[in-house]
Amino acid sequence: MEHLTLIPAWMLIPFAVMLLCIAVLPLIPHVGEWWEHNLHKLYVSLLLGTPVAIWMIANKMDHELIHQVVFDYIPFILLLMALFVTTGGICIRGDLKATPLTNTIILGIGWALASFMGTTGAAMLLIRLLIHTIQQRRYRVHTILFFIAIVANCGGLLSPLGDPPLFLLFQKGTPFAWWMQNMVGEWLVTGALLLIVYYIVDSYIYHHKEPTENLMADIREAGKLQMSGLINIFWLLCVIAATMFINKTYIPIMGEEHAAWYIKLLREWTFILIILGSWVTTKKQVRVDNNYSWTPIMEVACVFLGIFVTMAPALEFLRQNPLPITEAWQFVYCTGTLSAFLDNAPTAMVFHATASTLPIDAATAVAGIAPEFMKAISMGAVFFGALTYIGNGPNFMVKSIAEQEGINMPSFFGYMIKFSLIVLLPIYIIVQLIFI
């Protein structure tokens, strides 16, 4: 960077206010109803993001701003949109008996798929099936919360396709199979503990709290599985292939400093073509049967625009004022804590840069950092994204779809107090103590 601008601490205020808006506005009477409209979320994002953008341009940080919006936000949204549109065109219909075992199996399948089709892809593929399965149950919220943790986050640890921070670490030079070779233990133990806890919780609710009439309706209305829109399996594979192969590793010109912007965004152009292809080749009735709506992805786009812009000075502030951490366990919790409130992909990059300043053994280094730091950063970025609704893109989408289907989801703070801090965090601490 030719011109170094020191970020004052007060430039973190817009980002903090953005987070507070997401957390608090839905709880305020009347204001909560106003906040429900995506256009109003966009207004808030623009209100907070525009002054930040003006300040960055005035202080010769336009390069950082452009990079944050064009090369971070747009690819982030287009990848999520490509996965949302393709998986939203695969309709898995059926109302299975919503027993604890059935629900646990659905969660387990999503957990296994997440590393290979992305947490967003797996979540969007299975969330509607899960909601249809549990629709006769009175107590449904806990199932959606565990779905967010297991499928939309923790399942994506085994490959760069699983979660954006791992893809960026892959771009930094981590071998594609490194996570599969080195982090299966963390993936297995975390997933197994979450599935076991869910099965115990759902079994208790099923046998002791569910009204008999709800259980009888669930049995009476159960039906067989049916799938339609299978052309979207092809389009989903195209998304996976584009994510894996259309990058500067395989197309070096994309990484050249003076390459045209449209060359650098070649993967994103491909995503747009895939979105159009999926939309055109999918029968309209399939999406109707799937209760398809643009609302969830539009909510993510509007909210995360404000997050990405106001987050730019916050990330630069962290780069200029690195945290004094030197131990692997510290990287787990520092990366994890910030990933819960910042986007986990750029957060992983910040801590990769921090780790790269520490002494390493060149013979064992992974992407320029010690292997134990790579494991810690990966675990913190992927797992801790489940601690809040904004920690990972799919969280908001799952929440929005569930609310569209009449499930009353917890507030921002309610999610943390009633679920993530008392269920997820203890499990993460156990896994960290075992492996890192």
Located regions from the model:
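Transmembrane alpha-helix boundary signature
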Residues: 30-31, 52-70, 84-98, 112-125, ...
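Interfacial loop-to-helix junctions that mark the boundaries of transmembrane helices
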Residues: 1-11, 33-43, 63-75, 176-186, ...
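Core mid-bundle transmembrane helix pairs that form the ion/substrate translocation pathway
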Residues: 179-281, 421, 432
